[in-house]
Every structure is written in structure tokens, then in C-alpha cells.
Regions:
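Non-catalytic surface loops within mature trypsin-like serine protease
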Residues: 9, 91, 154, 197-199
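Functional-site microenvironments in short loops/helix caps that host divalent-cation chemistry
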Residues: 36-177, 184, 189
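Short, structured beta-strand segments at or near domain termini in extracellular proteins/domains
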Residues: 189-199
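A short glycine-rich, aromatic-capped structural motif
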Residues: 1-33, 53-54, 131
Length: 199
């Protein structure tokens, strides 16, 4: 299996849109931080992880390139490796050389560039796994609900939302599930994705 070294960036997603001419059937909240009139992202966002995409949006992107989203256990493997380390980089506590600075407030600040913290790389060189954005993985469906497993963790928590998540939630033993309701509701500013490819 080949794993993308970084989450998909705004520049990569823009290139995909130009090549594929793809637009989702339901575009509520789709690329909400981009300019809807000309399809551009804000200045300086080229290397930031693309967000405001649903699980379906991410799946379509991966499939277009002959790839797919990782299963949760695959994500765990390339993040944690065979030694059970608590963090991608090993056993040292998180700091701002390895993950972005945590913020808590009313405004959702942009994520860091995907290559901003090389000291946070995993045992196999995969970067930006925790502390920047959640990452889409598996979907589990039963007779009445669908849930996606979110791996990694974001750099921001809304003010007064201690229920949102403990932070820093960077330990690889933890994950969140996301109740999927509709594409428009599933898109948010704290979840990105990376692709894997079977070989």
C-alpha cells in the first residue's frame, strides 16, 4: 500500500477540480472558505489541508486518481507503527515543533501548512497526522445510521465547547466517530483527508 505523505492540499484539490470539472450534487458548505465566484482559495492557503469537504467529496477525489481513503486500522498502522508508540513521532510529549499551536475561540483559524512540522512525522515518514485537522477514514453503516471514523485531531476547539473533544487529543489510541447526516451537514472546517493506493 502506498500512502500520501501529506493530507490533500487546497492547491491539489483545485488542480483536481480543473481536470475533472467535478461539482457535487449538493454543494451546501462545499469549500466554504474558497471564493465561490472564481473557484479560488484564499491567498496563502496553497499548502494548507483542504477542508469543507464531505466524506463523499473526499472519496470521489481519491477514486479519480485510482486511490481510496484509508481504513481506520491502516491509518493507525502508518501513524503508530509496530511499536505501539503514543504519538506518530514516538514517546515525547507534543510541542509546537511537532504539531500546530492549539487555539480555542469563536473564530476558526486556518490550519497550518501540511509540511510545517516535519518533526511530527511517523515511523515511516508520513506527516501531518495529528494536531492540524481530523482525517476521514472508514464509514460504518447499519439499518438506521452511518458513521465515519475520524483519525488525527484538529488544532482548534470552539469556545465553551468542552464536550467537543479533549485537547490536545493527539494520542494515537484515540479517535472520534462522526454521524453522517447529509453532505452539506458533514462538511466542516476541521476535517481533511489523505489517500492511499493499493499496489
Amino acid at each position: 500500500m502506498l500512502v500520501d505523505k501529506y493530507p490533500v492540499t487546497n492547491a491539489e484539490y483545485q488542480d483536481f477540480l480543473r481536470k475533472s470539472n467535478w461539482i457535487p450534487d449538493l454543494d451546501v458548505n462545499w469549500l466554504r472558505d474558497w471564493n465561490a465566484e472564481n473557484g479560488s482559495f484564499p491567498d496563502g492557503f496553497e499548502s494548507k489541508p483542504v477542508v469543507w469537504l464531505s466524506h463523499q467529496d473526499a472519496t470521489f477525489y481519491c477514486n479519480y486518481y485510482g486511490k481510496r481513503l484509508p481504513h481506520s486500522w491502516e491509518w493507525q498502522w502508518f501513524a503508530q507503527g509496530p511499536d505501539g508508540r503514543p504519538y506518530p513521532w514516538g514517546y515525547e510529549d507534543p510541542d509546537e515543533t511537532r504539531i500546530p499551536k492549539f487555539t480555542n475561540g469563536r473564530q476558526h483559524p486556518p490550519a497550518d501548512n501540511v509540511d510545517a512540522h516535519p518533526l511530527g512525522a511517523s515511523w515511516c515518514g508520513i506527516e501531518d497526522l495529528v494536531g492540524n485537522v481530523y482525517q476521514w477514514t472508514d464509514v460504518f453503516t447499519d439499518e438506521h445510521t452511518s458513521r465515519a471514523v475520524l483519525r488525527g485531531s484538529p488544532h482548534w476547539r470552539p469556545s465553551g465547547s468542552h464536550w467537543y473533544q479533549p485537547f490536545p487529543n493527539t494520542a494515537l489510541s484515540e479517535h472520534n466517530t462522526y454521524l453522517l447526516m447529509s453532505e452539506g451537514m458533514d462538511r466542516n472546517g476541521g476535517t481533511g483527508f489523505r489517500c492511499v493506493q493499493d499496489v
